[in-house]
Structure formats: C-alpha cells, structure tokens
Amino acid sequence: MNSISSDSKKIKRYRRGVGVIILNKKRKIFIGQRFDKDKAAWQMPQGGIDRGEKAIEAAKREMQEETGIKKNFRVMHESNDWHYYDLPMHLQKKLWRGRYVGQKQRWYVIDFYGSDNEINIKTKRPEFQTWRWSTKNEILSLIVPFKSK
C-alpha cells in the first residue's frame, strides 16, 4: 500500500491576476503608492481575474478601477507566459483567506496617449494614495521585494 505524505498532497495554488504597465508619451511608467501601513508599498495597477472574464478584459477593468483611465490608450503587448510570485508566509494566511500561496499574473503594456488630468486615483474603491511617472530603475527600487523577481 502506498502512502502519500501530506506535503505531497499540497498543491500550490496561485490566484489568477493581471498587471498593467502604463507608458506615457515620454515612455515613463505609471506607479502608485498603496494605502498600506508600509509607506514604501508602490506598484503598478494589478488585480484578480473575475470568473468568466478574459485576462485582457481584467487588465482594462483594473486599469480603469485604479487609475480612472477609460480612453486614449491602446494595448501594445501581452506577456506570453504567466509570471508567478509567492507571498511571504505572514501574508499567505492574511490575504484571500489563505487560499493561495501567491499570484500568477499575465502582464500588459499599455500606451497611454492622453493627458495626466485624465488620471484619477480617487475612484470608487481607491487603491493608491498618490501616483507618479517613473523609470524602470526607479520602479525596481520602490516595489516590494517579493514582486520584483
């Protein structure tokens, strides 16, 4: 009789999500500072894919929900693969009722050719307390380490 250890029964579960890299006319990237206790928590717009929703639809929805951008953009690129990250252990139990160990995300590059006054982070359920346009190197120094790999 074969016995299966409880460790091998555990299959890592990742929440399906999307991330959005919004580029302005100067090729800088939108980044927002989250409403978290950790004031250094900056990130690009991202979120989960709803049941029955396509990833591209989720990306556009998340962008609108988090930045207010509804027009003057075009999707330039979709990542070929899912990008995975594991949450730190203390967050795995706290977020999503402990159902997931992390996220797998499909990323989209968006060309935003509108003006800054079209961006409104004071949305129905705001995610960001402030935002700015940044370079790739600035972003890598600002985002939480477990998301930068």
What is the predicted role of each segment?
Residues K37-A40:
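A conserved beta-turn-beta hairpin within the catalytic core of GNAT-like acetyltransferases
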Residues Q43-M44:
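A short gly/proline-enriched turn/hairpin at secondary-structure junctions
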